[in-house]
Structures are given as C-alpha cells and as structure tokens.
C-alpha cells in the first residue's frame, strides 16, 4: 500500500513532525510511505473560480498544488497530520484540503484515511471540530477510517511523550 502523509505543521522538528516520523517508521515495515510537508510547498487558497471544473481538473493557479495532486494520485491511503490551532487544522493543511475542491480528486485511488493531531490544550473537546469534519469526509468519499492518534497537552517542541510516539509507531505497524 502507498501511504501519503500530508503534514501540516509549519514548525520543523515539532511535535507533529515527531508523531509523523514515528507513524512512518512503523508503516514503512510493510508499506511505501511518503511524507509531504506542506510548509515546504507554495499553495494559495482556493479562489472559488471553478476553472478546474471547466478544464478537466486543471487549476487556474500555478503553484505546488499540481505536485500535491500528483502525490495524492499515487496514494492508497492518506494521513492528515496537524497541530491544532483554535480547534482547527493548521492554515497550511486546510489550504491544501480546500484545494481538493477540484474534479481531479475523482481520479485518486485513496481508499483509507487517517489522522494525527496534536494540541497544547488538555480539554476533552479539543479535537471535536476536526474529528467531525474528518468523519464527514470519510462518508462523502466512502473512505475507510484507518485510525487516528490524538495527543493533548503538547505545546513546546518535544512535549510529545514516548508512549504517544509509540502509539503512532504501533498504529503504522498495524496497518494492513
């Protein structure tokens, strides 16, 4: 299985990156894993012009989204990874997701979706808004829920705990 991780953290070497690396190490035991850090891509927000619907999925914007579409086209599973900012995904990852409002998405072979989230707060509702959207996306695209790792109380670089990294690793290792 080809697994693409879209990592939405703007911070290099932070908690999201640590969890992504742990997951990827586990998953790489049985699968091909590709990590794409959206912070390294130049992607503008969707302009809602619908040019993509008139041109077989070709976006009017000339940026790195075409590269991301290509990566997504080769994936069997997609993992969205993000720090939580104001109960939502990072702006970088949300921008990429919004740009999937494009008919090119219908050519993707993605069958499974997973989620890695890390936030500084510890309240029980921290991930509710994102997991609600996640489940709506699963239903809309008829995707299998491959699982998730949700980490609370990790603000500064390295705050993620060893058992949380192990959880991400074991989730990756367990994928069939």
Where on the chain are the PLM-derived regions?
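Flexible loop residues that form catalytic
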Residues: 83, 153-154
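Cofactor-binding loop segments of dinucleotide-utilizing enzymes, especially the Rossmann-like FAD-
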Residues: 8, 38, 117-120, 151
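Short, glycine-/small-residue-rich phosphate/pyrophosphate-handling segment
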Residues: 108-148
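N-terminal beta1-alpha1-beta2 submodule of the flavodoxin-like/Rossmannoid cofactor-binding fold
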Residues: 1-81, 87-103, 158, 162-176
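A charged, well-structured terminal subsegment
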Residues: 134-151, 159-162, 169-176
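Short glycine-rich anion-binding loops that position phosphate/pyrophosphate groups of nucleotides
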Residues: 84-86, 120-121
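Structural signal for conserved beta-strand scaffold positions within catalytic alpha/beta enzyme cores
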Residues: 35-37, 61, 115, 147-150
């Amino acid at each position: 299985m080809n697994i693409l991780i879209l990592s939405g953290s703007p911070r290099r070497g932070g908690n999201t990156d640590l969890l992504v690396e742990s997951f990827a190490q586990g998953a790489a035991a049985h699968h091909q894993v590709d990590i794409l850090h959206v912070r390294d891509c130049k992607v503008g927000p969707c302009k809602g012009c619908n040019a993509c619907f008139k041109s077989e999925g070709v976006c009017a914007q000339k940026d790195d989204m075409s590269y991301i579409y290509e990566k997504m086209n080769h994936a069997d599973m997609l993992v969205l990874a993000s720090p939580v900012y104001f109960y939502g995904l990072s702006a970088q990852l949300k921008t990429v997701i919004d740009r999937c409002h494009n008919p090119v998405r219908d050519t993707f072979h993605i069958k499974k979706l997973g989620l890695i989230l890390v936030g500084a707060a510890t309240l029980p509702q921290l991930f509710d808004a994102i997991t609600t959207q996640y489940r709506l996306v699963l239903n809309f695209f008829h995707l299998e829920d491959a699982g998730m790792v949700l980490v609370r109380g990790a603000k500064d670089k390295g705050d993620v705990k060893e058992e949380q990294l192990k959880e991400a690793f074991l989730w990756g290792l367990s994928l069939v």
